[in-house]
């Protein structure tokens, strides 16, 4: 599907990668999982993001995953490919490859991690990716994971490039409000923080790139629908019930919690690849009870890790 269709999508799911017990990709688990997502208000899919455990996927596995998901989806919703690394040349090559591969509305390029570039280095990095191919680029700013923060003014400078179409923002509401207020009119703003959906949408964001939509898509849809129609109190009531679930889904390094819930629901997404490990039985039971409303409301007090899409 096209970029114009992506612009109408408010709930984008960062798809997990199902694995067999031996660590190989379980492609047979994808159709049922994807149908579940599409039936619960997912309007677009992000492939090979961090929730997909992309750091542990080989390039060949990513391409095979792209082909299989495209076959299953069959044009029903737009697809976004995770194409960013901390090597500009590699990111440029991947953007070109995905553009030639076809079938993607955009590519998601993360702020480079580990090598700690300056703002000028970040600007040049994303400029090179944007100019490498016709693939529209969404920048992914998640300083809690990559250490470096793409400053709002650097992002707004990049937003002037016609092939940089949006940002997935995992910073804070001050940052988000600033870029929404000052962005070009057609520049897309997605929060990458499930817990910020209520505030981000009220500030004027276009949607969310979500982990929680794997398990709580109907709640997210209902909340956004209330906001869109001016029913803020009703949306806030959903947000209050939703926050403990988000806390549970990020109480252990993601995507371990969401995989625990999906496995419980019968979707056979399997284990994680090292260095990530599955939740303990005790952790999984607590997470499942909260996320699926199987126990009295309980807040997770250990703290919330920054979502990793």
Swiss-Prot record:
Catalyzes the condensation of (S)-aspartate-beta-semialdehyde [(S)-ASA] and pyruvate to 4-hydroxy-tetrahydrodipicolinate (HTPA). It is an enzyme of class 4 (lyase). The record marks 50, 114 as: Part of a proton relay during catalysis. NCBIfam families: dapA. The keyword Lyase applies. It catalyses: L-aspartate 4-semialdehyde + pyruvate = (2S,4S)-4-hydroxy-2,3,4,5-tetrahydrodipicolinate + H2O + H(+). Pathway: Amino-acid biosynthesis; L-lysine biosynthesis via DAP pathway; (S)-tetrahydrodipicolinate from L-aspartate: step 3/4. This is 4-hydroxy-tetrahydrodipicolinate synthase. One of its GO terms (molecular function) is 4-hydroxy-tetrahydrodipicolinate synthase activity. Pyruvate binds at residues 51, 209. PROSITE patterns: DHDPS_2 (PS00666). Disulfide bonds: none annotated. Keywords: Amino-acid biosynthesis, Cytoplasm, Diaminopimelate biosynthesis, Lyase, Lysine biosynthesis, Schiff base. Pfam families: DHDPS. Belongs to the DapA family. Homotetramer; dimer of dimers. Its EC number is 4.3.3.7. The active site is at residues 140, 168. It comes from the Bacteria. It is found in: Cytoplasm. It comes from Streptococcus uberis (strain ATCC BAA-854 / 0140J). GO terms for biological process: diaminopimelate biosynthetic process; lysine biosynthetic process via diaminopimelate. GO terms for cellular component: cytosol.
């Amino acid at each position: 599907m096209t970029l114009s269709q992506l612009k109408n999508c408010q709930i984008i799911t960062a798809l997990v990668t199902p694995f067999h017990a031996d660590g190989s990709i379980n492609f047979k688990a994808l159709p049922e999982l994807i149908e579940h997502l599409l039936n619960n208000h997912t309007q677009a899919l992000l492939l090979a993001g961090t929730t997909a455990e992309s750091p542990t996927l080989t390039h060949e596995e990513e391409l095979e995953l792209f082909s299989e998901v495209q076959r299953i989806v069959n044009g029903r919703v737009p697809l976004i490919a995770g194409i960013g690394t901390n090597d500009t040349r590699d990111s440029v090559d991947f953007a070109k490859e995905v553009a030639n591969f076809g079938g993607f509305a955009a590519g998601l390029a993360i702020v480079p991690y580990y090598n700690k570039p300056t703002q000028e280095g970040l600007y040049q990095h994303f400029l090179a990716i944007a100019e490498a191919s016709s693939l529209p680029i969404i920048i992914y700013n998640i300083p809690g994971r990559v250490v470096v923060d793409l400053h709002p003014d650097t992002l707004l400078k990049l937003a002037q490039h016609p092939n940089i179409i949006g940002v997935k923002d995992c910073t804070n509401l001050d940052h988000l409000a600033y870029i929404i207020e000052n962005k070009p009119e057609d520049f897309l703003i997605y929060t990458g923080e499930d817990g910020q959906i209520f505030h981000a949408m009220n500030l004027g964001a276009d949607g969310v790139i979500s982990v929680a939509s794997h398990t709580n898509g109907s709640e997210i849809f209902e909340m956004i629908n209330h906001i869109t129609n001016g029913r803020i109190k009703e949306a806030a009531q959903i947000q209050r019930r939703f926050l403990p679930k988000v806390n549970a889904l990020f109480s252990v390094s993601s995507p371990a919690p969401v995989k625990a819930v999906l496995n419980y629901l019968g979707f056979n997404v399997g284990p994680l690849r090292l260095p990530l490990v599955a939740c303990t039985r005790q952790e999984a039971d607590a997470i499942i009870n909260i996320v699926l409303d199987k126990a009295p409301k309980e807040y997770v007090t250990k703290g919330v890790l920054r979502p990793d899409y």
